[in-house]
Regions:
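ABC-type nucleotide-binding domain
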Residues: 1-235
Length: 235
C-alpha cells in the first residue's frame, strides 16, 4: 500500500538515511561498518524517479566510473533491458540527445534506460523501487523477461504495487504502516487468504467486466432504492 514505508526501507540499504534502531547487515557485516562509497558500489538502484541528463543516450547509460566502457558492453546492457528496439529506431542511435531530464523519451523508455544503467553496473545487490511503474503492459512483459536473467546470482529487492512483478520472488514481504504484517512465497500468501491475497484479488480477479454499449438501460422502478534474500539481514 502507498505510505507503508516500502521506499523508505529501500533507502536505508544504500544509507540515504541511517536507521535509528536495529541493524542492517550485508553479508553478515553491519552496513555502517562499510565506507559509504564502497557500500554504494555494491548496490544498483532503479527507482520510480529516473534522472536523465541533457546528453546522449550513451552518456546517460554509462557515466561516472562507467564512462570508459565500450559500446559493445553498453549495447549488451541495452539489449538485456529490452531498450535496443527504440534506441536503434532513433536517428542517432546511442548518440541521440535526450533533452532536459529526458524530455524526448516516454516514461517506459526512461525506465528501461535506468534498468540498462543498473545492468551495466552489474552490482551484487539490485534494488528495484517501482521500476516498472511507468511501463505499459507490453513493455512490462519485456522487462519481466529481462529481470529473470538479471536477478540470477544477485540479491534483488523489488518494491512493487503491481504484484505481477513479484510473483516469482523467493520471499514476499507485506508492509503496512511501517510494519511487516505478512511474509512468504506468492503461493503461501495466497493460501493464507490475508492481506496479500486480498490485494492480489483486487488486482487480478475483481476487475469489472466492461459494459456492453448495446445493452439497453434497465427500466426504472416505481420505488428506486440505493444498493448497498538473501544477503540483507535486519534486526
Amino acid at each position: 500500500r502507498s505510505g507503508s514505508g516500502k521506499s523508505t526501507l529501500a533507502s536505508l540499504f544504500p544509507r540515504f538515511y541511517d536507521a535509528k534502531r536495529g541493524v542492517i547487515k550485508l553479508d553478515g557485516i553491519d552496513i555502517n561498518d562499510f565506507q559509504l562509497a564502497s557500500l554504494r558500489q555494491q548496490i544498483a538502484l532503479v527507482s520510480q524517479q529516473v534522472t536523465l541528463f541533457n546528453d546522449t543516450l550513451r552518456n546517460n547509460i554509462a557515466y561516472g566510473d562507467l564512462a570508459d566502457i565500450d559500446d559493445a558492453e553498453i549495447m549488451l546492457a541495452v539489449q538485456r533491458a529490452h531498450a535496443d528496439e527504440f534506441i536503434n529506431a532513433m536517428p542517432e542511435g546511442l548518440d541521440t540527445i535526450v533533452g532536459d531530464d529526458g524530455v524526448l523519451l516516454s516514461g517506459g523508455q526512461r525506465q528501461r534506460i535506468a534498468i540498462a544503467r543498473a545492468l551495466l553496473k552489474d552490482a551484487p545487490v539490485l534494488i528495484m523501487d517501482e521500476a516498472t511503474s511507468a511501463l505499459d503492459n507490453e513493455s512490462e512483459k519485456h522487462i519481466q523477461a529481462a529481470l529473470v536473467e538479471v536477478m540470477a546470482g544477485r540479491t534483488t529487492l523489488v518494491i512493487a504495487h503491481r504484484l505481477s512483478t513479484i510473483e516469482s520472488a523467493d520471499v514476499i514481504v507485506v508492509l503496512e504502516n511501517g510494519c511487516i504484517v505478512e511474509q512468504g512465497t506468492h503461493q503461501q500468501l495466497l493460501d493464507r487468504g490475508a492481506q496479500y491475497a486480498k490485494l492480489h484479488a483486487a488486482q487480478f480477479q475483481d476487475v469489472p467486466e466492461p459494459e456492453d454499449p448495446t445493452k439497453p438501460e434497465p427500466e426504472p422502478t416505481s420505488n428506486p432504492r440505493l444498493a448497498p534474500h538473501g544477503l540483507f539481514e535486519t534486526s
